[in-house]
UniProtKB/Swiss-Prot annotation:
PANTHER family from the UniProt entry: COILED-COIL DOMAIN-CONTAINING PROTEIN 97
Compositionally biased spans, kind Acidic residues: 241-261, 324-343
Modification Phosphoserine, positions: S275, S337
Biased composition, class Basic and acidic residues, residue ranges: 262-277
Keyword Lyase: no
Protein name, entry field: Coiled-coil domain-containing protein 97
InterPro entries registered for this protein in UniProt: CCD97-like_C, Ccdc97-like
Subcellular localization: Nucleus
Organism: Homo sapiens
Residues modified as N-acetylmethionine: M1
Gene that specifies this protein: CCDC97
Principal cellular location given in the protein's record: nucleus
The entry's keywords: Acetylation, Coiled coil, Nucleus, Phosphoprotein
Modification Phosphothreonine occurs at: T47
Annotated region (Disordered), positions in chain: 1-37, 200-220, 234-277, 292-343
Length: 343
């Protein structure tokens, strides 16, 4: 009886450790897999599985850098329910570390778009498997892509973001564009506004009449906020004017201007455009603001949310054709913004 019991115990695997069969995709054969935690919280609180004792500190640092790079990307680490709070970076790294050590092939397949060529050393222990070799080769191809290809991808993403912002309406509203480029706005639009248009642009605090229901047309708090924003805008305008004057002075030192040029400059200052010409000026101003965004010159905009976001790669056929025509026919600095439909 003791011999039978001993043989039975020898056949039973240890609890919390499963020996995967060769049919388990993404798992290494003969590799014990720790029992999975019940949920994401336990995974985040659990200590990541350590590498073998003979693994060097440099390799540990490389794996840690790779995990943090994937966690910092916009790739979803795990599925979450609606309304569930976002995972912290520590939680993401813990979940990624568990998947990396338990199922490195699954990790490589799922997060290969967030990997860089220097991260491939972290998957040397699975090389030789045709799936690992395929995904590693794909990561390597991405890293050795031609500069023109990378530049085109970046422009495609910014172009897709531009279309979204145009459709949203707020980012390229007169108010927002004037705040970002006050001097450019003044040159194309502001100096030609009528007194009525200037009055309509400046809200005033109008308390409700006695006995009349309702709230004031412009609450005092909003008026104070707009007054502060206007002062900040005027400071930007003054700074941009000083920068432009400095550039003009340098150009005047290099080129001599005759009286005829000065006379033509005075005539241009006295020119007052009609309604059709004002519309053309507005379109040109908007086009330059679009190009300014594409060139990465909007200092207050976080371009990493676009340049590093693969979601903006999903352009429809019409937008892709328009983008190719836009960038192939014109130089980046001089190209006007394309006319976009409002679909």
């Amino acid at each position: 009886m003791e011999a039978v019991a001993t043989a039975t115990a020898a056949k039973e695997p240890d609890k919390g450790c499963i020996e995967p069969g060769p049919g388990h995709w993404g798992e290494l054969s003969r590799t014990p897999v720790p029992s999975k935690p019940q949920d994401k919280v336990e995974a985040a609180e659990a200590t990541p599985v350590a590498l073998d004792s003979d693994t060097s500190g440099a390799e540990n640092a490389a794996v840690s850098a790779m995990l943090h790079a994937v966690a910092a990307s916009r790739l979803p680490v795990c599925s979450q329910q609606q309304g569930e709070p976002d995972l912290t970076e520590h939680e993401k790294v813990a979940i990624l570390a568990q998947l990396y050590h338990e199922k490195p092939l699954v990790f490589l397949e799922r997060f290969r778009t967030g990997l860089r060529e220097e991260h491939l050393a972290c998957f040397g222990h699975v090389r030789g498997d045709h799936r690992a070799d395929f995904y590693c080769a794909e990561v390597a191809r991405q890293g050795t892509a031609r500069p023109r290809t990378l530049r085109t991808r970046l422009r495609n993403r910014r172009y897709a973001a531009l279309r979204e912002l145009i459709q949203g309406g707020e980012y390229f509203s007169d108010e927002q564009m004037r705040f970002r480029a006050p001097l450019l706005y003044e040159q194309y639009i502001g100096q030609y506004l009528t007194q009525e248009e200037l009055s309509a642009r400046t809200p005033t605090h109008q308390p409700p009449k006695p006995g009349s229901p309702g709230r004031p047309a412009c609450p005092l708090s909003n008026l104070l906020l707009q007054s502060y924003e206007e002062r900040e805008l005027q400071q930007r305008l003054l700074q941009q004017q000083e920068e432009e004057e400095a550039c003009l002075e340098e150009e005047e030192e290099e080129e001599d201007s005759d009286e005829e040029d000065q006379r033509s400059g005075k005539d241009s200052e006295a020119w007052v455009p009609d309604s059709e010409e004002r519309l053309i000026l507005r379109e040109e101003f908007t086009s330059r603001m679009h190009q300014r965004f594409l060139d990465g010159k909007d200092g207050d905009f976080d371009y990493s949310t676009v340049d590093d976001n693969p979601d903006f790669d999903n352009l429809d056929i019409v937008a892709r054709d328009e983008e190719e025509r836009y960038f192939d026919e014109e130089e980046p600095e001089d190209a006007p913004s394309p006319e976009l439909d409002g679909d």
